[in-house]
């Protein structure tokens, strides 16, 4: 009976809400304690807020109030994830995730970070938090967002540090090099030297290098100070290659990380993939620059981005932010536009620590007692009852960082830039929101200490640029590509790469710049830790080719490039198979007619992708998955094209025989997976990403959180990435009213709202929505106005 009454109340409440927000031109006035003056919040047809205030305090207050009104439960879940407090709601199911976050200790880090913020930054965070709390104060048991009522709890007051800790989630999503260090050690131990050396060679003929140059690919140099020498150094220090149990523990820990980040939309595959590019006016149809950006993160409902237009005497800015974070993270102001993609440098190091029987850890100064802190996690005993019981864990912290792996008598500690309380990204975005030119753009980024990013730039005067920003460590010895011996000083961080030494471009002769997580600097760059871990070059190369051919770029042609699904490596492989007659007549005919695009109805795309995976596994001699993955991503394309004898597996006379074997195995695998009817063997069956709410699978109640079931297609090697384009921006400096900005679903986190998924159709089809900016365009778009008054 209780659930029936609750359901009826919800239906009535949401029906009333729908009527209120649908009245065209409605004006509403609300008294809110904490404001210094009146604030105007206007909304357009997509409920995108346009907020104007007489001072920055009230602007951030109103932004917090507005975002909380649309995404309060999402905000609460993000801070709970980063603080390790989800088991209080979900019980044992997420306890391991909470333990991981508690070991990382970000709650303590952000508390310490506040002392390093300038007064205006602290005021912005405090004003935003006050606005969130003012909205929370308006809620009662009937008006709480539905997720709170289902889970039977109420939101705690928002704190300024809650906004800061969301930045730590992003850092976690964009940094996983510690596990790569272990995998590299495994690769070197398990592969013949010639194979490992070729895998360790970072160069690829499809690379899009923006800074510096490469030694010619035809003459591979001997590695200097990289994996081989570092491994020899490690062994001389008594560090053995990570054993299978250590690697298994690392994989489990990374799986916990993936589950945790995916639940709130922050997990990203393929080294946190994203695309951005900028085109100068000399290559555009109207003579003005165009900037594009589409970050790739996990599909979730609601999406991780929230659109905001903010205006005060110090700025006018529009774009997206994370719910819970003041200001705009990616977007534009009156003068400049900016976008970002992940760089992927090595900002994490593992240290094999030596402990004695007394629990002390070995250091260069002798045996020392590590810091040990106790963390208490409240764990819900029953999903239908909010009562909890405490679970305590002890976290050991050495001088290098917290111990995150303890297996087989070995303990590994993690050092990470995100653990430094001085490293925050909020100050940089605060500056970007107000920057007027290239120099002010660089000044803002010079203080950026978050996950390293490729920031692209365009301004209303026609200038374009690119600058890497982030804290990238310098080591006393080696480059951090393998675990260090924690008892020595070899892994000591001696500083960070200076901002003016980070790769950058300003108005390059080419007239455009593209980054897609590729290796952006040549092998002549002095800091190898910046260019060692990166995504494959395929997306960057495809975008480079499209932009090179587009002499008169438009918003429409840029949008088409964002939606492009041509797959370079699979197209190359299909041609090689056809040329060698390396498959059955049916397969050869199918591949010969393929256009190289990962269309959802493509049979060829599905089959050749399956064949590629088979080839990689056989080249790795069907051994552990790590070598197979490295082979597929690093050298398979070249090995097949050049018929490299080094990579031809034993038992095969030549590559044609290898291709035929993989064709047979792939067809058999697809028959088992999809049935004998080949008409249903289409790429859309394998690649579709779907948006889902964290509660969508809950019995009885999950259906109300359903999102569109349409598949979202692409692949990891195409500009239109399958998993997952989290938003699309096309900014047009000098003509801001033609800027396009679209998120996957909608502004509201309320599944009953008309704005829960009203942007999906535009997002799915690539027809991005115009985002008005001028006062005249905004005025014409407004359908509802709310005035907040003190």
Model features per residue range: what roles?
Residues 529-584, 662-790:
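Terminal end segments
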Residues 2-12:
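Bacterial N-terminal signal peptides that target proteins for export
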Residues 271, 312-322, 331-335, 340-487:
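Glycine- and hydrophobic-rich flexible loops that cap the catalytic core of alpha/beta enzyme folds
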Residues 479, 586-674:
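A terminal-accessory region detector
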Residues 96, 107-108, 129-130, 427-453, ...:
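Proteins synthesized as precursors that undergo proteolytic processing into mature forms
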Residues 11-22:
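Bacterial N-terminal signal peptides
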Residues 27-290, 295, 301, 398:
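Substrate-recognition/specificity elements adjacent to catalytic centers across diverse enzyme folds
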Residues 410, 447-550, 612-617:
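Hydrophobic alpha-helical segments
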